[in-house]
Amino acid sequence: MLAQIPRPEIMDEDQLMKEVLDKFVNCHEQTYEEFLSTFTHLSKEDNVAKWGAHGTDSSENIFSTVKWNHKTESNGRHFRNTSIFLHTSSEHSEEDQIVIDEGHKVGSSFQGDMTRAGKVKVDNFLDLEDVDMEEESKPQMNKDCLLLPGEVEQDISTSVPSYDPSVDLPLTSEVRPKPAVGRTQKQTEEILGDEVQPFFLDEEFDYDNVTLTPKFTAGEIATIQELSKQKRVGSGTNVCELHD
């Protein structure tokens, strides 16, 4: 038996749907300024005011900057390692970042002192003043380097090879007439290129009277005929033996 929904409840649902559609259709069109105002953002003035309020009490905030310049010369390059860190006493943090020199080690998850791990901060910067841009632009090939399997040592050449188009002739079993000497000379004088050249018949060549050369010589033809006769004689004797 199907449950019957009371009529007032159906009317209430229809009325509710109608009200929702009316609100959606008749709602105010939002402008771009109103759209931007819905986002929470801090202006530049708010940031300046915030930092100024924290900077008034000099006894609470202690800014210490340690710069460590270390230049190493390797292939004409100098690297400068600079570590800048900031710690605030208001946070009651006793963990200071450690600046390490060359040769020092810090503990890892496998070995070493774990108390110093995670506190080291080293930023590597490239000193552009000491870099020779002309030297970087020229590729340097190491003669002592070994080639990987499958690689071939090639010399870098800037010359561009000239384009030589090739003409592929199709293989056919037809007998082609032997051209005259003058025609071969004209073909050698033709300039090959990518442009399509118009086709012209050779006026000096007689296309009606063409001397065809046989595929086999007279001796080869005689041998073929002799073999065919022997084959016929052999097949005839076999037929006679079957009848007997």
Swiss-Prot record:
GO cellular component labels: 9+0 non-motile cilium; cytosol
Disruption phenotype: Mutant mice show no obvious anatomical abnormalities associated with ciliary dysfunction.
Expressed in which tissues: Ubiquitous.
InterPro entries xrefs: IFTAP
Molecular function per GO: intraciliary transport particle A binding
UniProt keyword Phosphoprotein, yes or no: yes
Modified residues (Phosphoserine): 58, 235
PANTHER family: INTRAFLAGELLAR TRANSPORT-ASSOCIATED PROTEIN (PTHR35543:SF1), PROTEIN C11ORF74 (PTHR35543)
UniProt name for this protein: Intraflagellar transport-associated protein
Species, as recorded: Mus musculus (Mouse)
